[in-house]
Amino acid sequence: MNSTLYSTSPGTYWEQYEEVSQHSAHLNVVERLWSAWYAWMQNDVLATGIMSFVMHEIVYFGRSVPWILIDTLGLFKNYKIQNNKIPSLREQWDCAKFVLLSHFTVELPQIWLFHPMAQFFGLSTSVPFPSVWTMMYQIAIFFVLEDTWHYFSHRALHWGPLYKAIHKIHHQYSAPFGMAAEYASPIEVMILGFGTVGCPILWCALTGDLHIFTMYVWIVLRLFQAIDAHSGYEFPWSLHHFLPFWAGADHHDLHHEKFVGNYSSSFRWWDYLLDTEYTPEALKRRREGKLTKKAQ
């Protein structure tokens, strides 16, 4: 995005928006808001950094708060997977403070480097945005790539020395809750975060086709997935009932309760293919397999 595309220093952001609207009537409202932001800021690195960090905080805490209310008010208690382990407000608050500190000390510096990195690899910030179809298929690819990275790196983090040095912090809560999705050591945040940010960057480096707006939509969906997977609630309308290969809260809750298996983030296929599922069905299948081998 060329921040000097429109006249400089129009006054307020909304005055800049009006100017953009006059010169770019073909753009939709979101595209005009986007263009006005970069033009008004007059500093693309600062514009991207502020927008990225604010978006992350609003989405993360905005999505976590409903789960806090559900836990605190006892709503949907019948759907709580480990209903004897309801997190207290104190636990939620302590978790929130830890996560917020991590956001400012670990994630914020990386976010400020995002725009220079995006420019280096050719990510676009211009308008108009890509088509909905383009964003959909790219985000679907990112879900698959991130899930693959997450499975193998997460499984590696359960190796004894790495677990004790890095991953143990995340398993402080054996009954997870939404806010705890990013409750992790700085090293783990960077390792697993690579799947969310690094995979799309690599995609762009290989194809030369990726818009930062697509990245934002992807990150929002990934945050929703991570928070919901840690929510600790299994509903009749949970997504995996309609997409059997989707992981969901029931899949990840067992991982926190048993400290083993179910290493994937979004999908179930890696755990199934590599026999690391930890579900009643998988355990039964393993027992039957052992009995069959003994009988032979």
Swiss-Prot record:
Membrane-spanning residues: 50-70, 98-118, 125-145, 201-221
BP terms from Gene Ontology: ergosterol biosynthetic process
Keyword entries, A-Z: Endoplasmic reticulum, Lipid biosynthesis, Lipid metabolism, Membrane, Oxidoreductase, Steroid biosynthesis, Steroid metabolism, Sterol biosynthesis, Sterol metabolism, Transmembrane, Transmembrane helix
Membrane disposition: Multi-pass membrane protein
Subcellular location: Endoplasmic reticulum membrane
Positions of short motif Histidine box-3: 251-257
Domain Fatty acid hydroxylase: 140-276
Gene Ontology CC terms, in alphabetical order: endoplasmic reticulum membrane
Pathway: Steroid metabolism; ergosterol biosynthesis
Primary residence: endoplasmic reticulum
Pfam families: FA_hydroxylase (PF04116)
Motif range (Histidine box-2): 167-171
One MF annotation (Gene Ontology) recorded for this entry: C-4 methylsterol oxidase activity
Result of knocking out the encoding gene: Leads to the accumulation of 4-methyl fecosterol and 4,4-dimethyl fecosterol.
EC number: 1.14.18.-
InterPro entries assigned: Fatty_acid_hydroxylase, Sterol_Desaturase_Related
Induction description: Expression is controlled by the transcriptional regulator srbA.
EC class: oxidoreductase
Residue ranges annotated as motif Histidine box-1: 154-158
Cofactor(s) required for function per UniProt: Fe cation
Purpose of the protein: Sterol-C4-methyl oxidase; part of the third module of ergosterol biosynthesis pathway that includes the late steps of the pathway. The third module or late pathway involves the ergosterol synthesis itself through consecutive reactions that mainly occur in the endoplasmic reticulum (ER) membrane.
Family assignment from sequence similarity: Belongs to the sterol desaturase family.
Domain description: The histidine box domains may contain the active site and/or be involved in metal ion binding.
Note: In Aspergillus, the biosynthesis pathway of the sterol precursors leading to the prevalent sterol ergosterol differs from yeast. The ring system of lanosterol in S.cerevisiae is firstly demethylised in three enzymatic steps leading to the intermediate zymosterol and secondly a methyl group is added to zymosterol by the sterol 24-C-methyltransferase to form fecosterol. In Aspergillus, lanosterol is firstly transmethylated by the sterol 24-C-methyltransferase leading to the intermediate eburicol and secondly demethylated in three steps to form fecosterol.
Protein's recorded name: Methylsterol monooxygenase erg25B
